[in-house]
From Swiss-Prot:
InterPro entries: Formyl_rcpt-rel, GPCR_Rhodpsn, GPCR_Rhodpsn_7TM, Leukotriene_B4_rcpt, Leukotriene_B4_typ-1_rcpt. One of its GO terms (biological process) is neuropeptide signaling pathway. This is Leukotriene B4 receptor 1. Residues 311-351 are annotated as: Disordered. The gene is Ltb4r. It is found in: Cell membrane. The lineage of its organism: Eukaryota, Metazoa, Chordata, Craniata, Vertebrata.
Amino acid sequence: MAANTTSTAATSSPGGMSLSLLPIVLLSVALVVGLPGNSFVVWSILKRMQKRSVTALLVLNLALADLAVLLTAPFFLHFLARGTWSFEVTGCRLCHYVCGVSMYASVLLITIMSLDRSLAVARPFVSQKVRTKAFARWVLAGIWVVSFLLAIPVLVYRTVTPKNKTLICDSRYPSDGHKVFHLLFEAITGFLLPFLAVVASYSDIGRRLQARRFRRSRRTGRLVVLIILAFAAFWLPYHLVNLVEAGRTLAGWDKNSPAGQRLKLARYVLIALAFLSSSVNPVLYACAGGGLLRSAGVGFVVKLLEGTGSEVSSTRRGGTLVQTPKATPTCPEPGPTDSFMTSSTPPESSK
């Protein structure tokens, strides 16, 4: 998201003006849905959840990352509507840096959720030992530090340049090598590696649950597919366009050619689509709430997270972990926060 969020200004041609409406619509939907939705999630966890599970902490940070990027949407909407950047170089770099940090934080949080669930299913005793709030806070701190570091190239390459009597907040590279490096670096660290980890984790979960013939393995399998597809749907097109541009740059093709301009316009729309990823999670929580939404009202997020935080209670008797099933929500949570807790999964520590 940080690479080229405003690389193409609203053009004066009729086609360009028509195309610019789609990003405006997508950004507006993301803002209208995501801002109150994620704010509600943050409020629910901080104000209504007395004992926050590790899952709740991960969801809280994911909502905060989504809120951060959504707060930049008004600046980009202003740019799209006016066709010029009005917030100077500092605003240009800050907005895009926030987008970059949020992108990395969101992807890393989803990856950690996936690895957490895989460990809980594959190594329940190990998961019980390491899955504490203290350890989770260290992991979360590490995620944010890494996200701030990975987004630094945005601060280096972003600037405001004049173009056709307007100002554009764009990336400016000293050489084509710098441009290719940035595009590949963002695609690999911001999508490819995390996506491979998510796929590997949930594939392992599905395989193990199917082998154990758990009662809900079929539903879990469907959720795994939905999670992976949703993750890819918002981010894969954006990174593919960046990879194509990196290839064109290496081949020495003219970026001002008709094909190059179409590529810019495609990214123009896909970046706005990526913004929607910051608004989809609250919608998934509401859908997952089902009966909880009707019975618990505004407290459904708390009930949902309490249900997904631990589907079993565990006690040690004579050195053996004994699980006792608890009540579960009407449906498991679809999305990166789905706990996939089974009868082999230990509870979250309250440390």
